[in-house]
Design a protein with these regions (language model features):
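Short, well-structured N-terminal submotif of metal-dependent ribonuclease cores
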Residues: 1-19, 30, 34-43, 108
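Residues that scaffold the ATP/ADP-binding catalytic core of kinase and kinase-like folds
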Residues: 2, 26, 104
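Acidic, PIN/NYN-like endoribonuclease modules and their adjacent C-terminal/linker elements
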Residues: 16, 20, 84-115
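Active-site-proximal, substrate-binding regions of enzyme catalytic domains
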Residues: 24-56, 64-66
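Active-site neighborhoods of divalent-metal-dependent phosphate/nucleic-acid chemistry enzymes
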Residues: 53-100
Length: 115
């Protein structure tokens, strides 16, 4: 359902510059743990490549300042705070199922998709 919604959005979705590494890591860890085969991983990556996803080129520039402050303020991982920082900076809605990140976004006044 999330992928279908992403395909339907004209402008696509913005993600932090670390997104591809996070996705690749999750898929590879599932291969390493024998939960999925490499064919599944590769097919998932091919499907994701078709989505209108835009990588933010400024994620790292904010890592040691605003992203870190958000992580500290809301007790988030720096990785999760990067998504919140991006939503704040670009003034875009945030799509996440993570309860703690959703709460932090609400406190920061960020619109949540699916809310």
């Amino acid at each position: 359902m999330v992928f279908q919604k992403a395909k339907e959005r004209e402008n696509g979705a913005w993600v932090p510059g670390l997104w591809r590494l996070e996705v690749a890591n999750v898929l590879q860890m599932n291969v390493n743990r024998r939960r999925h085969r490499t064919t599944f991983r590769d097919a998932a990556l091919a499907d994701l490549a078709l989505l209108p996803i835009h990588l933010d080129g400024d994620t790292d520039r904010h890592a040691w300042d605003e992203t870190l402050r958000l992580a500290e303020r809301h007790e988030l991982t720096v990785y999760d705070a990067a998504y919140l920082e991006l939503a704040l900076r670009r003034k875009i809605a945030l799509a996440t199922l993570d309860r703690q990140l959703r709460a932090a976004a609400a406190r920061e006044g960020v619109q949540l998709l699916g809310a």
